Amino acid sequence: MDPEQLIQRLFNEESDDASLYAREAELFSRKMVDGRRVSETFSRFAAEEASHLRVLGAIAGGEPAARRREIGAGSSLEFALKAHEQREAESIRLYNDLSASLEDPAHKIMLKGVIDQERSHLETIRRYLKALRASKREA
């Protein structure tokens, strides 16, 4: 993909992710016993994904129009975490591809910050999945 296509794809994905994390934060705060921590984490992720949209807009010279698609919130925490694990890993790959395709060092630095946040999201999601699986084994 060329840089414009990568930016558009990432813009669409980040827009979807920001919305999805926000909806799931609300859902899991109500649905889960002691879901406050997951809700706070997902709310933070939603805000960070929204900040990635601003970075993409700065690189593109203006925010592309997002092609919104409705992604249903996870029916369970495990389902949501597995979906986010895949989405975050794909975002990291796409951001690395975009960075490699750009020449402007300032844009590469901006993307490094985004990639670092995406990696942090992925690590957190994997920790939650590991803890969830361990709690199921103990039950």
Language-model segments: which ranges?
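Non-heme di-metal
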Residues: M1-A139
